[in-house]
């Protein structure tokens, strides 16, 4: 039986590729997709969800737009990474269908209520929508199997020296998610910076030769440019968000540890930092499964295999 999931995302090149991967995987049943503000403004990320689902011929999936700003802060976006549209690079279709009239939280709550089994929430942007869901619907917590997030880092940040972008945008929301008592799986920079796509991998995807693999290659062509900056020391481009979906499909290609994680919401230098109690110093019980390593080749092979689904 396929695993029911809700995807909350802010497309974003890597979010878009996570959508492609999830919808090429019969093991997963994508019951709803909600958009968050982050990589671009809320209007643009919602439009990008609709454009991707139009491309993938999946207008049957309910879509709703989410919070327009973080819980307690002004919105910051990553247009320097993802371009003016949020998905610069390939020519994507205009949306062929409209989102639902309700909010992301309403769609998530309805989906959870109507599901006969607990649903996994995959969140690849800031945690605002998920935190709002948890706070406004405590009665639905038991309907959530787990929350798989792309966010955080045990080590270095990518937006500040201490903080990863998704968590930095809305640290209060992320703290609500981590302390919710619901199992959390964290794909942070420790693993996503190892899930790099190299130039040869992009050509491998392009050579698959179907319309979707071609678009994915073009998304990666654009995404690669930002990551060529020497300061990162990357060979390729880290494919952050697809790690969440890949973990659901093939957990064996990832190495994980069970640890307590908290989010710094006050720090002068460390706002948005995910504090991972790696050495069990706090006495707090683990609240997260933290990804720390990935078999890069296995990750690339999984993407290549699933891109053939669209032939």
From Swiss-Prot:
Coiled coil: none annotated. One of its GO terms (biological process) is pyrimidine nucleobase metabolic process. This is Pyrimidine-specific ribonucleoside hydrolase RihA. It comes from Salmonella dublin (strain CT_02021853). Keywords: Glycosidase, Hydrolase. GO terms for cellular component: cytosol. The active site is at residue 240. Disulfide bonds: none annotated.
């Amino acid at each position: 039986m396929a695993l029911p999931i809700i995807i909350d995302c802010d497309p974003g090149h890597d979010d878009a590729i996570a959508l492609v991967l999830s919808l090429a995987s019969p093991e997963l049943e994508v019951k709803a997709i909600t958009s968050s503000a982050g990589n671009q403004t809320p209007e643009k990320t919602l439009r990008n969800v609709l454009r991707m689902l139009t491309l993938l011929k999946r207008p049957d999936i309910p879509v709703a737009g989410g919070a327009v700003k973080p819980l307690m802060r002004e919105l910051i976006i990553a247009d320097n990474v993802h371009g003016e549209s949020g998905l610069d690079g390939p020519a994507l279709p205009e949306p062929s269908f409209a989102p639902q009239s309700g909010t992301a939280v309403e769609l998530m709550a309805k989906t959870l209520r109507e599901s006969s089994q607990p649903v996994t929430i995959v969140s690849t942007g800031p945690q605002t929508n998920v935190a709002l869901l948890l706070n406004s619907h405590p009665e639905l917590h038991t309907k959530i199997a787990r929350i798989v997030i792309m966010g955080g880092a045990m080590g270095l940040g990518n937006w500040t020296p201490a903080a990863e972008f998704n968590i930095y945008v809305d640290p209060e929301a992320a703290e609500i998610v981590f302390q919710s008592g619901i199992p959390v799986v964290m794909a942070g920079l420790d693993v996503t910076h190892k899930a790099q796509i190299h130039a040869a991998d992009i050509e491998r995807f392009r050579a698959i030769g179907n319309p979707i693999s071609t678009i994915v290659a073009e998304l990666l062509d654009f995404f690669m440019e930002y990551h060529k900056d020497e300061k990162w020391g990357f060979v390729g481009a880290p494919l952050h968000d697809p790690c969440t979906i890949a973990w659901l499909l093939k957990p064996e290609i990832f190495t994980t540890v069970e640890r307590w994680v908290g989010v710094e919401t006050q720090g002068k230098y460390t706002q948005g930092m995910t504090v991972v109690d790696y050495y069990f110093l706090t006495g707090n019980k683990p609240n997260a499964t933290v990804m720390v390593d990935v078999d890069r080749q296995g990750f690339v092979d999984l993407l290549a295999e699933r891109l053939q689904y669209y032939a």
